[in-house]
């Protein structure tokens, strides 16, 4: 009977899974991120499937590919669907009502939550009412959905309070009439995407530079450390704000600036120190004596033994990057409206403190996200603790 021993990495992964709080937090973060990436399929003002005059359209599915550059997205004009409107683009929610009244073979399937993160609903926020006498005007006594709960039927009244599952907007709308729930979900996608991009790029650059400085040392290390000291002295957030004020930043541009300005420095210091420690050990001397190339020694021998500190640091880096984006957006130097972001929601809330829902819900989601990432970092730190699986005791 043969037995296979587990590697240290397998033991660490097994240990991480045994820490339920961190493991389930990781699963939940990943699940919510996937759900947010698939947002166009369930939070969108465009239909999943539309059959009109024996032609089929799939607008929401096309929206799912909006991150691919170079794709020409079709404009669905109101006249194509015989919709009388002063707007060029068709109102699919209104089209659904029109199709439901007809019996001509047309068909439309809207997403579960039919609102778009960038959609301005200010001219569509009339509280719904039951037009009993069919005069197209609200008359006293007709039943209505009291979204702002003031006991009166209202027109065009953003921001609206949360209507729960009884009304149209689960968490209400902001001061521009955009749905808060939709913008929180889209903001989650943008925040996590930004944090992941910055963290991954910072790690790639930091590991490469730190490995070279720690392994080759000498004048290269002296020059590299002086360069890092110069970059460290630069006020990161203020510099980013100045650069952002001269351009129209998107997620990728902001992430790139964050990495180049300071994101790579902390990882470089960690890896440099680990390489200094590891290259003095016998297995490195043995590899050198066997004629192994420096690149193989650095990235196949030393690097795998140097990653523990930076792996445990990764979740904290993600938290820091999320707060960087939130801070920039809150101050007005980040992503430009109508792009959804938690910082932009909080900035709107600061101007509308009497509308509690605009402040409470983004803060709750941001806090829960930070807590879950913190649980993940604690679990990783405990699972990758070198004392647990050390052979030298």
Where are these regions (language model features)?
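Gly/Trp-centered helix-boundary motif
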Residues: 1-203, 207, 212, 338, ...
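Alpha-helical transmembrane segments of integral membrane proteins
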Residues: 173-393
């Amino acid at each position: 009977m043969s037995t296979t021993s587990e590697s240290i990495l397998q033991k660490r992964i097994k240990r991480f899974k045994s820490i339920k709080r961190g493991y389930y937090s990781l699963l939940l973060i990943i699940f919510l991120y996937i759900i947010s990436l698939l947002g166009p399929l369930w939070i969108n003002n465009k239909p999943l499937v539309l059959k009109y005059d024996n032609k089929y359209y799939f607008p929401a599915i096309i929206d799912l590919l909006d991150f691919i550059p170079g794709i020409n997205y079709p404009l669905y004009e109101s006249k194509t669907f015989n919709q009388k409107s002063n707007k060029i683009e068709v109102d699919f929610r209104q089209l659904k009502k029109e199709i439901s009244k007809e019996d001509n073979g047309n068909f439309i399937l809207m997403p579960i939550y039919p609102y778009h993160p960038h959609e301005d609903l200010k001219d569509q926020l009339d509280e719904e009412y039951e037009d009993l006498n069919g005069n197209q005007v609200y008359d006293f006594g007709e039943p209505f959905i009291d979204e702002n709960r003031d006991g009166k039927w209202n027109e065009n009244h953003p921001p609206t309070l949360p209507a729960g599952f009884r009304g149209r907007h689960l968490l209400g709308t902001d001061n521009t009439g955009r749905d808060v729930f939709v913008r929180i979900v889209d903001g989650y996608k943008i925040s996590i995407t930004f944090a992941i991009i910055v963290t991954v790029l910072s790690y790639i650059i930091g590991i490469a530079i730190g490995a070279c400085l720690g392994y080759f040392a000498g004048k290269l290390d002296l020059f590299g450390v002086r360069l890092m000291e110069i970059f460290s002295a630069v006020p990161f957030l203020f510099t980013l704000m100045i650069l952002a004020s001269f351009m129209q930043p998107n997620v990728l541009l902001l992430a790139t600036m964050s990495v180049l300005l300071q994101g790579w420095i902390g990882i470089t210091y960690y890896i440099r120190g680990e390489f200094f420690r590891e290259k003095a050990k016998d297995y490195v001397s043995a590899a050198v004596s066997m004629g192994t190339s420096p690149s193989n020694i650095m990235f196949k021998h030393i690097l795998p033994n140097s990653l523990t500190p930076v792996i445990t640091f990764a979740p904290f880096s993600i938290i820091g990057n999320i707060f960087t984006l939130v801070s920039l957006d809150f101050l007005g130097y980040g992503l430009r409206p109508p792009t959804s972001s938690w910082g932009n929601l909080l900035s709107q809330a600061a101007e509308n403190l009497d509308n509690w829902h605009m402040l409470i819900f983004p803060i709750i989601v941001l806090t829960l996200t930070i807590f879950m990432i913190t649980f993940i970092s604690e679990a990783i730190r405990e699972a990758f603790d070198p004392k647990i699986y050390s052979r030298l005791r």
